[in-house]
A protein has these predicted regions:
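Compositionally biased Ser/Thr/Gly- and acidic/asparagine-rich
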Residues: 1-176, 184-187
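Short beta-strand edge segments in extracellular beta-sheet folds
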Residues: 254-258
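Short loop/turn microsegments at loop-to-beta-strand junctions
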Residues: 194-196, 222
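Short, surface-exposed loop/turn motifs with a glycine/proline- and acidic-biased composition
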Residues: 211-246
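Extracellular and select intracellular beta-sandwich modules with Ser/Thr-enriched
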Residues: 248-252
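Beta-strand signatures of extracellular beta-sandwich domains
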Residues: 113-115, 196-200
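Short, glycine-anchored, charge-dense loop/turn motifs used at functional sites
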Residues: 174-176, 180, 199-207, 239
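Solvent-exposed serine/threonine-rich low-complexity stretches and specific carbohydrate-binding patches
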Residues: 126-129, 208-215
Length: 258
């Protein structure tokens, strides 16, 4: 942790996470005199994972850094900031409890919150709220963010992040419709899901499967070129398309004109 002399020259928030058996006990964000907004000696790599692991880490590809980081300490010259983090797990089960420990004082009037992207929850870490993650999975990273700064910035940043994340599953109307020769089918996922998108004819027979795989949370689109699973063009008429996950199923109608 920081030495006392360092505390007076900045601040850190240490984030730990565990399931009672496995955990990642030291990850830090913060600002420090002498640190920069790019990779420097205060930014440390995440240790390699074992067969069973809990890893809270940060990726900074915009810095040209390929490896994951366990600490991201930035310049004192900037007051507002967002630290995006990922929870990755392997061969372990949740729930996972998140705890924070602040070292040094934030600038007067500043606040720090933890944002859970999946649950759309905002936690003010000064209030010692219980933070529990229940929906982490091995297939995808679980995204959270630490947002620190003046209240107006923190509120706006959290709102902006959440506005990009769907609140519910949705299958949208294809476009164009009617179509020839191809159309786009879009859908929204509020969490990572194993997704199946299929086309059916008017008799309910499967024509082609467009997606049968995991997709991350967010907005997605897939194109149908009017062909069946053998690559043959299908005839003019009404067809149905479906989105199915473990938690959701919806069907909509489309029309192919030639």
């Amino acid at each position: 942790l920081l030495k006392e002399a360092d505390v007076n020259a900045g601040w850190q928030i240490v984030i730990s996470i565990d399931n009672g058996e496995y955990g990642d006990i030291y990850n830090a964000i913060g600002r420090k005199t002498g640190a920069s907004e790019q990779l420097d000696i205060w930014d440390n790599p995440e240790p390699p994972a074992l067969d069973q692991y809990v890893s809270l880490n940060m990726t900074r590809k915009e810095w040209g850094v390929k490896s994951m980081l366990t600490t991201d300490i930035r310049s004192m010259d900037i007051i507002n900031g967002i630290w995006d983090m990922n929870l990755d797990i392997g061969n372990v089960q949740g729930p996972f409890t998140v705890s924070t420990d602040q070292i040094g004082s934030l600038p007067e009037g500043h606040v720090a919150v933890l944002l859970d992207h999946i649950e759309h929850q905002i936690y003010d870490i000064s209030k010692n709220q219980e933070i529990v993650i229940t929906k982490a999975m091995e297939e995808f990273s679980y995204p959270i963010s630490m947002i620190v700064g003046v209240p107006a910035f923190v509120e706006a940043a959290a709102k902006n992040i959440l506005s990009t994340i769907p609140e519910k599953f949705a299958l949208h109307q294809n476009f164009p419709n009617p179509f020839n020769p191809s159309t786009h089918i879009s859908f929204s996922l509020p969490k990572p899901s194993n997704v199946e998108v299929k086309i059916y004819n008017i008799l309910g027979q499967s024509v082609v499967t467009l997606i049968n795989d995991w997709r991350n949370l967010g907005h997605h689109s897939v194109q149908w070129n009017g062909r069946d699973k053998w690559g043959e063009s299908v005839g003019t008429g009404i067809y149905f398309y479906s989105l199915e996950t473990a938690d959701f199923r919806q069907v909509k109608k489309l029309m192919l004109l030639k």
